[in-house]
């Protein structure tokens, strides 16, 4: 995974996807009321909000702050028959293969002025259409691999036999419209799929787009409740946003935006909730480095060991890793300075087997 986490935003036409994306990146992608106005994916890079960086920057008198980043890719509106080239075809599907996770925007608001491509509001049907298209595209990928395996099987390699069995299992699921991630595959089975970059193996989060008044309390919105129930079956994340409201907030100065959110009964923007959900979905966390030059956040997978975390900064750090000098952010703040934390014995030296924790403030020692 690159340093920047990449999330592809997909949805049927006119569900509020581009409006939401514009709000996310203030990128001004053409949010228009007709299908296919975004064929080339628009990419927006946003900072991952982290108040700890401000605290570290003050403490270490850092010249700059470098937050972690998340890339959002607005992938063109999808329609039925996509994988057969009826809508935007394979161009759309190749864009989505490159992302770490997929965020599906589904419409859960009524508005007579905005047409729905399927004629009525039904988010579960919309999810089903998207899943069907992604399953069909994956079937083509698996089929090509199966053809290749037939040739390889002639060598009598046992591993090929195992892989063939996995492909059959996945193909059967996809044929029934079951995404590969819902097939309960073992880790060993998943390894065979690694290089195929199957679309339906990617973790998914659902963004339910509601009317402005329902964001703080969507309990009365039956569409949202239906999506939540569906998502629970695959441990997927669901976030509730109003794309219209997000685009309004995005235009405001920070203080006014805060007041606007408070009036709506919200503590944070939909974007912040989306980023948190993305982190949770992909099992990510943050460690921090701080000094006079900069205070910076680094994104790693949960359970990453110290040398691999060091490698995020520079490959030399991993190669020549000696030790990591670590203090937890909370301990550091409680003590007021690194020197005070050291006096209290809260600054630790950790070796190559240390598993990083969220909020570790680190200085790596290495020798190349």
Where are these regions (language model features)?
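Conserved G1/Walker A P-loop phosphate-binding module
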Residues: 1-115, 143-144
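C-terminal-of-GTPase-core extension/linker across diverse P-loop GTPases
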Residues: 1-10, 15, 21, 148-355, ...
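Glycine-rich, flexible loop/turn motifs
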Residues: 27-35, 42-44, 52-55, 84, ...
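Amphipathic alpha-helical transducer elements in NTP-driven molecular machines
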Residues: 36, 50-53, 66-72, 86-100, ...
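Short capping/connector residues at structural and topological boundaries
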Residues: 36, 41-44, 51-53, 58-65, ...
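Conserved Switch II/interswitch segment of TRAFAC-class P-loop GTPases
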Residues: 44-49, 76-86, 97-159, 173-186, ...
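Short, flexible surface segments
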Residues: 98, 357-358
């Amino acid at each position: 995974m690159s340093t920047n986490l990449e999330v592809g935003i997909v949805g049927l036409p006119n569900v509020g996807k581009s409006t939401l994306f514009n709000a996310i990146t203030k990128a001004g992608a053409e949010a228009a009321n007709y299908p296919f106005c975004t064929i080339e994916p628009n990419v927006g890079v946003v900072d991952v909000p982290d108040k700890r960086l401000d605290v570290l920057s003050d403490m270490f008198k850092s010249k700059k702050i470098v937050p972690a980043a998340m890339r959002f890719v607005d992938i063109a509106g999808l329609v039925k028959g996509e994988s057969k080239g009826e809508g935007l075809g394979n161009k759309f599907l190749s864009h989505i293969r490159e992302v770490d996770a997929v965020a599906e925007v589904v419409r859960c608001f009524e508005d007579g002025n905005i047409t729905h491509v399927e004629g009525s509001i039904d988010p579960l049907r919309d999810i089903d259409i998207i899943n069907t298209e992604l399953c069909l595209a994956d079937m083509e990928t698996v089929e090509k691999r199966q053809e290749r395996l037939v040739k390889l099987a002639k060598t009598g390699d046992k591993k090929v036999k195992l892989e063939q069995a996995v492909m059959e299992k996945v193909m059967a699921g996809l044929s029934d419209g079951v995404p590969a991630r819902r097939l309960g595959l073992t880790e060993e089975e998943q390894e065979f799929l690694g290089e195929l970059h199957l679309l339906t193996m990617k973790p998914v989060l659902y963004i339910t787009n509601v009317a402005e008044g329902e964001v703080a309390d969507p309990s009365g919105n039956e569409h949202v409740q239906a999506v939540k129930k569906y998502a629970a079956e695959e441990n997927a994340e669901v976030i509730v946003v109003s794309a219209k409201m997000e685009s309004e907030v995005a235009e405001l100065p920070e203080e006014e935006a805060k007041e606007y959110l408070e009036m709506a009964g919200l503590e944070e923007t939909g974007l912040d909730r989306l980023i948190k959900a993305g982190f949770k979905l992909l099992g990510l966390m943050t460690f921090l480095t701080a000094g006079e030059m900069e205070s910076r956040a680094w994104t790693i997978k949960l359970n990453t060991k110290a040398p691999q975390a060091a490698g995020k900064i520079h490959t030399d750090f991993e190669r020549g890793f000696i030790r990591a000098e670590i203090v937890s952010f909370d301990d550091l703040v409680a003590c007021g300075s690194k020197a005070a934390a050291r006096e209290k014995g809260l600054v630790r030296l950790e070796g190559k087997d240390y598993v990083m924790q969220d909020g570790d403030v680190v200085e790596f020692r290495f020798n190349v």
